[in-house]
Amino acid sequence: MNPIVVVHGGGAGPISKDRKERVHQGMVRAATVGYGILREGGSAVDAVEGAVVALEDDPEFNAGCGSVLNTNGEVEMDASIMDGKDLSAGAVSAVQCIANPIKLARLVMEKTPHCFLTDQGAAQFAAAMGVPEIPGEKLVTERNKKRLEKEKHEKGAQKTDCQKNLGTVGAVALDCKGNVAYATSTGGIVNKMVGRVGDSPCLGAGGYADNDIGAVSTTGHGESILKVNLARLTLFHIEQGKTVEEAADLSLGYMKSRVKGLGGLIVVSKTGDWVAKWTSTSMPWAAAKDGKLHFGIDPDDTTITDLP
């Protein structure tokens, strides 16, 4: 089985020209990290975790150190990870003061009998596991302070659009043993209510992985994704004989028509077919397979290069 990793950097509005190159570099870095793990014989779970950690560590993306701020000006992060081999999974929500929520989600998967920990319980577990705590203000960037100020101003003027300031990072992978996995991480929505939890940590919505079908990681308007169970819906269509591209189009189309939700997703099937699809304006993504790196941000704009 030829290994593959696909990553995304969130589906939302247009990305400014001054950010595109930095976003490009971040996506390539994450895909290269994930693929490097697979090429050395690592598992799909290792690969998706490694790729997402790279994105959480990049302030260009809405996860980890680039997370957007809630209405109190604080960072609250959500993340989940799933192993398609045995459907084991781990998730955390509303976590603060840690650099990499996806690592904590994996600890939930491997070190507890549970699938999901939140808020204070997740924080207590992180401390028990020796996860380093960092000051919350270290996760707050000037860019996200300005985004929060702008959102509050526009909300006061009743000009806000709940689907414009979105962002998530995610990865799916297929390893040489035929195992699939997904990982998804986010800071949520700008100016969200304290305690708001979106789709990213929710199995079946923010992602899903099953060796019998494939793996999906989603992005977009979290409430809409939750309502249609976007990740599992996409895998359902694959179960019914649809190609990965057809399945992605069907599920995203249903979310748009049924609840007017915009978003995107990445998919890898158990046979190694993959796709990146979105209905939002843009979605940075990258895929690494067979020594080639595929990358795009806007529709009909894909580049293919050799991997180092």
From Swiss-Prot:
GO terms for cellular component: cytoplasm; cytosol; nucleus; photoreceptor inner segment. InterPro entries: ASRGL1_meta, Ntn_hydrolases_N, Peptidase_T2. The modification N-acetylmethionine is found at M1. Its EC number is 3.4.19.5, 3.5.1.1. It catalyses: L-asparagine + H2O = L-aspartate + NH4(+); Cleavage of a beta-linked Asp residue from the N-terminus of a polypeptide. GO terms for molecular function: asparaginase activity; beta-aspartyl-peptidase activity. Keywords: Acetylation, Autocatalytic cleavage, Cytoplasm, Hydrolase, Protease. Expressed in brain, kidney, testis and tissues of the gastrointestinal tract. Present in sperm (at protein level). Over-expressed in uterine, mammary, prostatic and ovarian carcinoma. Induction: By 5-alpha-di-hydrotestosterone and progesterone. Heterodimer of an alpha and beta chain produced by autocleavage. This heterodimer may then dimerize in turn, giving rise to a heterotetramer. Has both L-asparaginase and beta-aspartyl peptidase activity. May be involved in the production of L-aspartate, which can act as an excitatory neurotransmitter in some brain regions. Is highly active with L-Asp beta-methyl ester. Besides, has catalytic activity toward beta-aspartyl dipeptides and their methyl esters, including beta-L-Asp-L-Phe, beta-L-Asp-L-Phe methyl ester (aspartame), beta-L-Asp-L-Ala, beta-L-Asp-L-Leu and beta-L-Asp-L-Lys. Does not have aspartylglucosaminidase activity and is inactive toward GlcNAc-L-Asn. Likewise, has no activity toward glutamine. Belongs to the Ntn-hydrolase family. This is Isoaspartyl peptidase/L-asparaginase. It comes from Homo sapiens (Human).
